[in-house]
């Protein structure tokens, strides 16, 4: 009866399970980390190291996190974890944006019919409760993703000390002359009844009427019409617009002074338009019978002509502006300064005689000033009514129904309007050049971020910082009741900031203006009776103040921050508002580096929408796979562009994770009896393939560390994955199995030494990405003295300078030969010549150079490399050619009998069923 040698084999054994079970394990690990203050002790341990500050851009505290939030927070966490393991003290202070319209609207919605009589203080109380409630929810959701940080003490924009510092920044900017109050055409949300900043605008497709309207010319003070033989009573000027509702606000028509204009004769009437747009205008108006008159006339000649408004009892003025182009329309631009930025600027700056008319109230309804027949209509409803009116009156020349990109409020997602109102502004022109210099000093990743930010600052208008709402930091300005002038001084700002620091911004609504304003403050007119500004600050001013209210105030942080990292939409949001407030008050950018990521889209690259049913939630993925798979998704993605997410993608990633986990499991399973303090073999005593494996791990370390330094996590992931699958599973671990299970003590300890050293470094390298799995692996690794209990407390491995071109070339050649032999073995298996590869004897037909190369390797080692029982070398051609030059192969069934212990075939297997090697080991 054959003997059983199973008990003589060193079998793989480890409590580290093949099935990860992350959804159940991770919460227990989180409990352990919290109980043992792992994050706090890490920061304390690193306290004397150089500081690295990634300043958290505050997410809005109004709901559950989504895949975009998860992407953002995990990128930050990978950076923070890696820095803390790489010789830095990198504290992470999360923050929350807690003021603003979404919270106020939800608070109002919760009140139902009671909202009509509620006071501002009562409403603010409900808003605060809503925000703080969601902070707790979001804190727990971020922690579930494995994000480390000071979640017990996040920064909140509603905290008194934050609000006080924000008021002081406002005061500093006002003192420098950067803050002013003025009337301008600003983005206005009729649904929310408030002004908006550029950063609060999103664009979406909208359908509208594109109309061509003619205005009857009435006055020709320069005699231009007579000069060219055009009768005034038959002369018209033609405009084009897609906002029919703004026609009641028309007070001027703008021409480019340098463009050529022509009169187009239609019947017995003459219509003025840009010569270069005649054909497209006639086509759009479906007019075929027309005549373009000569000569062409420069737009400058028509300045100050007048025309009759199509339905109101007033005249409009022909004015000039360089913003008029030939890109579309008629070259004669309908100008309503009450509802257009360029319209407002050209009129106010160059034609002060032109009135600014705003016949629309804050809810988007036309007023009596628009005409009695239109009063009370919402602007969108007014479009059709006005269109029908000008059609009946003979002023409409043509209409097309088009789809175009139109600005919408990013909160309520309704279309917005431009509306000239009195607002508070930050004058960008006064420090724009300083901002350019600050932008140049920042490291932008990707590099295109520099030009994007530069272009946005270059092209932007003054920043509208006031909002007509309740839930926010009040505009800290007082008005003299006697003369109406506003009053901002060092003393008034200090009084407000001191009050807010003590009681919070609710105090603005609690006390009368005269109770807040210092008694020493007197208006220029001599009066000292005050009232408060009713508006609040733009929430972008809130978050744009975090560099001061957080980074400069919290002792564990630094300013300027080393890094700001957010989505690409923050170039017009937080990146920009922070830059503007910092440059305005300090003259420098608030950050040394800026890193940005793209949007999360579905598997087809489309935006995720609940209505489309193509979204995935972080909670779903965590429930099904675990948070480490979400983290792996982040690390495996090129986050600088849009990142795809979907169930198929996570399924594929779970397979990739399984391969990496099993690589670690193999290593753990084969070092269970290894004591690194006593069993470690010196490197120069290791087998050459063990040294190759360590060298491969060293290359991995160099590549991954470089990738981390550049925040290129997908490069790190692919290096780790390829190392696990190609270098380890497919080659090294495959080759050393026999040595681990069946060889003598020294040979086995050599392999274990390599595995141990590789596993320690590998676990550290993956720890920033797979924080849960890395800690699980780490808990099973036998520890040397000085090794930490938690892997995140460890230092990253350092890549050694171990360049050895000859060694690398040799092993590259060995692997190439092995790959060819593996293919030959697969064919032999398909031909039923062999079953397992250990049944094979391989003959290698070699060129002289290849023979000398392979013959230098002991044949038993060569057979182990190929995982066959026997290898013969023959000079000359023969067998099947592979990809390796100078090599042919043939495979036959190995001679001899199968060793009952190691399963190799050998002609010297004894009666006990053992090959000589196994017999010696059991000796």
Each model region followed by its residue ranges:
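Cys/His-coordinated zinc-binding microdomains
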Residues: 193, 468, 484, 524-527, ...
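Protease-associated
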Residues: 252, 259-332, 341-345
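N-terminal catalytic cores of NTP/NDP-binding nucleotidyl/phosphoryl-transfer enzymes
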Residues: 44-106, 239-247, 254, 319-346, ...
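Acidic, turn-prone loop/beta-hairpin segments
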Residues: 97, 186, 190, 196-204, ...
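Alpha-helical recognition segments enriched in aromatics with Gly/Pro capping
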Residues: 219, 316, 350-363, 469-471, ...
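Short cysteine-rich clusters marking metal-coordination/redox-active sites
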Residues: 189, 409, 480, 520-524, ...
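Secondary-structure capping and boundary motifs in well-ordered enzyme cores
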Residues: 46, 50-57, 68-71, 75, ...
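Residue patterns forming the tRNA-binding/recognition surfaces of aminoacyl-tRNA synthetases
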Residues: 2-10, 15-22, 28, 32-36, ...
